[in-house]
Amino acid sequence: MKVVIFDMDGTVIDSGEAIYKTVNEVRDELNLPPLDKEFIIKAINEPGRNLALEFYGIDTPSRSLKEGFEEKFKKFYDECATTYEGVKELLQKCKEAHFEVVLASNAPHDTLEKILKKNEIYELFDEVIGASKEIPQKPDPAMLHLAVSKTGADKAIFIGDSLKDELAAKNANMPFLQVSWGFGDESKTATYNAKNVSEAWEIILNF
């Protein structure tokens, strides 16, 4: 049995506008000029970057800054986040082919159900896995191992858009499909690449 594991932001859900608006609203409160959207999206998808320093000039953000960011992000996420074109149909095809379908996101686990239901795709996932005290964020492979163990699958592929995703798949010894319809670009080191949903479906069918 196959399990197809999807990253969320930049792969299934387009949250770029929400992230962009949140970062720049916090910067505005700190009397800093706005940052370019492309810079923000690239920064959040690269492991090891000090985002507080790059976005706000603060080495260690205060609790109030973190809470303010989270509050703003929830607001903008609810307003702006939508599924990428064709992705709902891709999820439906996976279900129709009797593949297990799992979401593995670095977002907090307790925030995932709401956004997936809002976009009418929650019921298309057999398992939804987010970050928590027990489950570390990618590139740690824990989420991917959990997706396999929960579904009992003997073949798995992870679909994402960032280096964090690719490293998680590598750490889990799992094939990785890099998609470039969202935040990501083509990867020279990924197992597979797809520019669009049709290419992704052909790879999922045949891996």
Q: Model-derived features: where do they sit?
A:
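Acidic, Mg2+-coordinating phosphoryl-transfer loop and its flanking beta/alpha structural elements
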Residues: 157-194
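Glycine-rich phosphate-binding loop signature in dinucleotide/nucleotide-binding domains
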Residues: 96-99, 150-154, 207
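N-terminal helical cap/lid subdomain that shapes the substrate entry/recognition surface
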Residues: 2-88
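Short, acidic loop-to-helix structural element flanking the phosphoryl-transfer center
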Residues: 75-103, 109, 113, 138-141
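Surface-exposed amphipathic alpha-helices with a cationic face
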Residues: 88-96, 148, 166-170
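Conserved Lys-Pro-Asp/Glu-containing loop-to-beta segment of HAD-superfamily phosphomonoesterases
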Residues: 3, 137-166
